[in-house]
Structures are given as C-alpha cells and as structure tokens.
Regions:
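Interdomain boundary/hinge segments at the C-termini of tandem beta-sandwich modules
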Residues: 68-70
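A structural signal for beta-strand boundary/capping segments at domain termini and interdomain linkers
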Residues: 22, 61-63
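Terminal processing/anchoring signals of secreted or surface-associated proteins
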Residues: 1-3, 20, 41, 51-53, ...
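Glycine-centered coil/turn sites that cap beta-strands in beta-rich domains
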Residues: 1-15, 37-41, 60
Length: 70
C-alpha cells in the first residue's frame, strides 16, 4: 500500500474487514508534500477474505479492496 500527496496534509491509512471492524492503523500523521509513503501489511494472522484500506486526508477519502489468501 502506498500514497503520495501533492501538498502537506494530515493523512490516516487504515485497514478494515468487510464488517467494518478496524484491523490496523498503518499511518496517522502529517504527510509531507511529494513524499512517497509505502507500507507493508502483514495479514498472516487474519482469515482469508476481502479487506479494505481507507486513506483519509484533509481533502479526500480513498477506499480500495484487497484480498488475503493463504
């Protein structure tokens, strides 16, 4: 998972299961402009299935699906 912002702003990157339960917060801070932020998520302890990551910034919310299959 990665993101890059065009201007400095507060960013929150979270992983959720499909029931809406927060699984993990990966980032919760001010993100610098033009910096590339990359995260590795270890889902080895989670059951197989579809999960969501949500990036919330001062200007937008982006939600994407991903799968865990062991």
């Amino acid at each position: 998972m990665s993101f890059e912002l065009s201007e400095e702003q507060t960013a929150l990157l979270e992983v959720y299961d499909l029931s809406g339960r927060l699984v993990q917060t990966l980032f919760n801070s001010v993100a610098s402009a033009e910096a590339k932020y990359r995260f590795t998520f270890d889902g080895s302890a989670l059951p197989n299935g579809v999960y969501l990551y949500r990036l919330t910034t001062d200007s937008e919310v982006v939600i994407e699906k991903f799968m865990i299959a062991h």
